[in-house]
Swiss-Prot record:
Family named by the database record: Belongs to the universal ribosomal protein uL14 family.
Domain of life the protein comes from: Eukaryota
Compartments reported by the entry: Mitochondrion
Pfam families xrefs: Ribosomal_L14 (PF00238)
Function: May form part of 2 intersubunit bridges in the assembled ribosome. Upon binding to MALSU1, intersubunit bridge formation is blocked, preventing ribosome formation and repressing translation.
Transit peptide as recorded in UniProt: 1-30
GO molecular function terms attached to this record: structural constituent of ribosome
Protein name: Large ribosomal subunit protein uL14m
The keyword Transit peptide is assigned to this record: yes
Complex and partners: Component of the mitochondrial ribosome large subunit (39S) which comprises a 16S rRNA and about 50 distinct proteins. Interacts with MALSU1.
CC annotations in GO: mitochondrial inner membrane; mitochondrial large ribosomal subunit; mitochondrion
Keywords: Mitochondrion, Ribonucleoprotein, Ribosomal protein, Transit peptide
Length: 145
């Protein structure tokens, strides 16, 4: 280690051996697009059993390929392909919409019914305005933000 004084006071320079040992992992993306890691927030068996790889989005069912709250996506989860509904994302949205700490999804079947029987995290109230599409998902939600 070597010491030097800089503009903001003394600095410590680490040897080269320490800097080569550093590693980095990718953070979760703010918007949901292809290869984004997501978090399953319902109590379905498929979403809650531990697995060595996190679920990832492999397709977004809209025109621009960027998923927002209320969009449907296709997930790769435990070697299977499953549809999911986005119920929260990290990217800031319009005014008065909540920003979540993680990209949250609820697993759904092909006909739109949720796979689980309970949602563990709060979901945004903006989904209530589109009630016809998501009435069964809203019925199993416990908290709204």
């Amino acid at each position: 280690m070597a010491f030097s004084s800089g503009l903001w006071g003394p600095c410590v320079h680490m040897s080269r051996a320490f800097s080569q040992r550093c590693f980095s992992t990718t953070g979760s993306l703010g918007a949901i697009q292809k290869m984004t890691r997501v978090r399953v927030v319902d109590n379905s068996a498929l979403g809650n059993t531990p697995y060595h790889r996190p679920p990832r989005c492999i397709h977004v069912y809209n025109k621009n390929g960027v998923g927002k709250v209320g969009d449907r996506i296709l997930l790769a989860i435990k070697g299977q392909k499953k549809k999911a509904l986005i119920v929260g994302h990290r990217m800031p949205g319009p005014t008065m919409t909540p920003r979540f700490d993680s990209n949250n999804v609820v697993l759904i079947e092909d006909n739109g019914n949720p796979v689980g029987t309970r949602i563990k995290t709060p979901i945004p109230t903006s989904l209530r305005q589109r009630e016809g599409e998501f009435s069964k998902v809203l019925a199993i939600a416990q908290n709204f933000v």
